[in-house]
C-alpha cells in the first residue's frame, strides 16, 4: 500500500478535479505483477493501468488501491467491474470514497465474492489526497498557506525588502507546490509590493495553475507581470470596481463586506469552476483572513537561518486575542531544503486541541 501511495503522488497537478490514486497488483503468490496511477483527467484510472501491466497474472491476485475503486461510469468505466472481470480475488483499499456518485465499489466487489479490506495506511493515503477529499467533504477547495520567513518570523525587513529571504532551493520547491495546485492566490498588498509572476518555472511537464489576484479596487497595473500569457489569470474585484483600464482580463466580481471580500464568498465560485486546491501565497493580511475563516487546511513554512529583529510578521490579525485561542498545529514534516527548513503542518481541530479555555 505504501508503494501505491507513492504512485498516487505522481498524479498531483494533472488529475484535478479528480483524485490522485495509485494501485499495485500482486499475483496469487504475493509477487508484484502490476502498478499504475491515475495520470490525467479523463484518462484510465490507476486500477486499469495496473491491470494492463499485470495481464493474466492478475487472476487470483490482490489489488492494493489508495482509494475505494469507483462504481460508476463517467469518461471511463467502473474500476470495481474491471477488477472483478480480471479475476482479482482480494481488494485492499486505504480510504473509502466519499463521493456519492462514485462510491459503493467495495460493496459491488463484495457482492461479486471478492474479499475486501479497508483502512490500510488510511492516514497516509488521506494526506496524499487531501485536496480532493477536502473538496468533496466540505464543498470548497483545499487551501495551503505557504510563507517564507526568518527564524524570528519576519517576512520582510523594516524597509519592506524581502528578496530573497529564503534560498534558491526553497524557491524551486515552491514552483513544485505551484505545479501541484489548481490555483495560486495573492492579495492586493503582495501585488503592489512584489509584482509577482506566480507561473510555474523549472518543473518539466507542469500544468500551469490559475493565477488569482484578489484586488478589490482593481488597482492592478495593466503592465503587472501576473497579466502576461505564461498562465491564466483571474482578477477578483469588488462589484463596483472600475476595471476599464484592464480590458481583456478575466474578472470575478464579488460583494464587499467592510471593504473586503469574504473568504468563503471567494472559495465557493472557485469550487464551482473546478478548482480543488489553492496555494495561498498572499501576505500576512490575506493569510490572517483565511485563518480566521477556518479556511487554512495546511501550512507550509520555509524558514531561513537569518534574523531581522524588525519588519512585518508572516501572519497578521487572524482574530486571535488570547493564547488559549491560538490555532494549534500538528507538524507532519520538517525537512532541510538547502540551508532552509521547510515545516509542513495541519491545523488541529478545536475539539481535540490541547489548548484549554476558561469558561
Across the structure, where does each feature detected by a protein language model lie?
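Short gly/pro/ser/thr-enriched loop/turn and capping motifs at secondary-structure boundaries
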Residues: 98-101, 123-124, 192, 219-221, ...
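Conserved histidine-centered catalytic loops in small-molecule metabolism enzymes
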Residues: 318-359
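Residue-level signal for inorganic ion chemistry
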Residues: 4, 22, 70, 109, ...
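Short, basic/aromatic recognition patches
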Residues: 1-16, 132-135
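Short beta-strand scaffold segments in enzyme catalytic cores
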Residues: 20-30, 147-148, 343
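Zn2+-dependent cytidine deaminase-like catalytic core
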Residues: 24-124, 210, 289-291
